[in-house]
Every structure is written in structure tokens, then in C-alpha cells.
């Protein structure tokens, strides 16, 4: 991240102005087992005869442990399973879709069933919509907004990242998977062999407490 990051408590809410270029690089460190690889626009230049004029050499740096990177990816997988990115997976019958799904969420349903880690983002007054999506060998970022933040959607239903930016990612990835020559992974993210941080939260609940919670849910008809 090379842009100015203000030293304020609200930084956790996403107050800095960052580019898609920077965001993709940052998220790439999670997908690359903690290794940052600086994004580049040009990987190779050849002349008209095919002779190599320029070959990009990746700039890399270890920034976090492979363990921390994997746990973060595991958390972000939850976004597409249970959170604001879950519309990448589910398929609401057409007759049951609300106006947002019928008229706004372009390309729905996407019906992905592979491992996807992601994060939606929405700024103040729905001026910016974000979606950052990761599969094991590809990180893609989508930003929707305007140079002037006075230009924005009036409601969160239309202006949130899950409605503005996520559909672009979904359509793009469907096209990527249609072209098998690209080799975009549908495999699971690889966990480090020495993973010591528990990621199965249910396993940490005492058996008696877990059982009582199940009974409570049954009592609610769930």
C-alpha cells in the first residue's frame, strides 16, 4: 500500500482512498501464503520478430506468516458462504426473487460451488462499491464509483458492494471458468502443514454446551 493511510481508529472501516491496483496486491499476499507479489501491468514485450525486449521480474516480499494468511483466507471464505457474498453461490427461484435480484443484480444466478474467499465493501452514502474475490491462483478486484462522491445511489439496496461490484466479479469469473485454457483453479485453498490456529469453531464449544444449543435450535423449529 503506497497511498496515504490516515492514523485514525476508523482505519478498520476502510477510510483510506486506495486503488484497485493496491488492493489486489494486498489481497494477493493472503492467497500467496503470506508473500506479497507487486502487481504489474506489463509482463513481457517482444518485437515484430518475437525477440524478447523486456521480461518482468516479480517483486516479492514476505509480509505475514503462511499460517496467518490461511486463517485470513478461511475467514474470507465465510463471506461467500454465509455473508454478503453468498449470492455468488445460492440460486433463488425466479418467482421468489425481490426487485433487487430481478432488476439490479446482473448475471444472477452465478452458482459457484468452488472455494472462493472475498469481501464486499460499501463507503459512506453508497458512493463506492467494492468486491475483492480470491481463488487459489487468481485475485480480482472490482470497484464501482465516480470521481465525485456526490454521485451515488440513494439506497443501500442498490448501492452496496454486493449489488454494484460483486455481479461484475461473478460474470467475469464465469467467463474465466468457461475458458479452461486459462487454468483458473477450482480447488480448495491449501492449508499450511504446521497450522496451529484452530479454525473449526464448533469443535471448541464444550460438548454439553454444544448439545444444549442444538436443543434450543430444535425448539425454535430449526
PLM regions with names:
Residues 1-25:
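Mid-domain, small-residue-enriched loop/turn segments at the edges of structured enzyme/sensor domains
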Residues 17-220:
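A penicillin-recognizing enzyme superfamily signal
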